[in-house]
Amino acid sequence: MMKINSYAKINLSLDVLDLREDGYHNIDTIMNLIDLHDVIEINRNNTNELKLSSNNSNFPTDKTNLIYKIFENLKKFRKINCSYDVFVDKQIPISAGLAGGSSNACEFLMYVNDDLSLNLSNQEIKEICRLTGADTFYFTSKKCVRATGIGNEFVRLSDFSNKNIIIVNNGMSISSKDVYDNLKESNGGLGKITVAIDSRDYETFYRKAFNTMESVSERLVEEISDIKEQLNNLGCDLSLMSGSGPTVFGIFENYNDYENCYSKLKDKYKYVFKTKTL
């Protein structure tokens, strides 16, 4: 049995651009991993059936799961004569804007590639991930990146690790499609924000960071704006929604404010995590 950590990501800024012919949207985003993670246990079996299970009853174990989808997409590139039993110990909230499902899928793909000595090229991995989900390929990077296209074209940015992060999620989920369908025009990209974070001008970055999906998601889940306000009042340097939400994160340069915020919010919402960027 192999155990693999599968990390969540946050969007340090996110702008949604135009709709593509393939149904995806072009985006401009800055992403970074955080230490919040699921643990995936993988055992090879000699059947033709991929068996998924989890400690979370809301975790899909059917063909809608991205682990299943990425395994099927892998078979378009290589002949596979075995399958796997996969148990996911879920710590990352589901459908929360933290890409837990995409992370699970990518980690599974990379494990199978190694386990079966498939020798997939980077381009093959990129295409398998594209067929599976827009942000899946990011998890091969594991760095602070500016991502464009559908989120699969990367420029690595300066290290943004070891930042104090509070994650807050009220237990609700949001359909990304519902948010995308109600978006208006973009903010014109992340040029200045990218320069700020890459030059470690965090004061400018914290002031200019944005997520164009927030305005739509806040109408669907009103508590998002309330959580942001509480994080701001408790001393965070930046509060922002991740992805399409409803998860909100706060970045704290001051460690005492970070600890105090966690203490004040940890019993107030369904999911409150104290974590760091990787």
UniProtKB/Swiss-Prot annotation:
Molecular function GO labels: 4-(cytidine 5'-diphospho)-2-C-methyl-D-erythritol kinase activity; ATP binding
Protein name in UniProt: 4-diphosphocytidyl-2-C-methyl-D-erythritol kinase
HAMAP family listed in its UniProt record: IspE
Gene3D superfamilies linked: 3.30.230.10, GHMP kinase, C-terminal domain
Keywords, alphabetical: ATP-binding, Isoprene biosynthesis, Kinase, Nucleotide-binding, Transferase
Catalytic activity, as annotated: 4-CDP-2-C-methyl-D-erythritol + ATP = 4-CDP-2-C-methyl-D-erythritol 2-phosphate + ADP + H(+)
InterPro entries documented for this protein: GHMP_kinase_C_dom (IPR013750), GHMP_kinase_C_sf (IPR036554), GHMP_kinase_N_dom (IPR006204), IspE (IPR004424), Ribosomal_Su5_D2-typ_SF (IPR020568), Ribsml_uS5_D2-typ_fold_subgr (IPR014721)
Task of the protein: Catalyzes the phosphorylation of the position 2 hydroxy group of 4-diphosphocytidyl-2C-methyl-D-erythritol.
Gene Ontology biological process terms, A to Z: isopentenyl diphosphate biosynthetic process, methylerythritol 4-phosphate pathway; terpenoid biosynthetic process
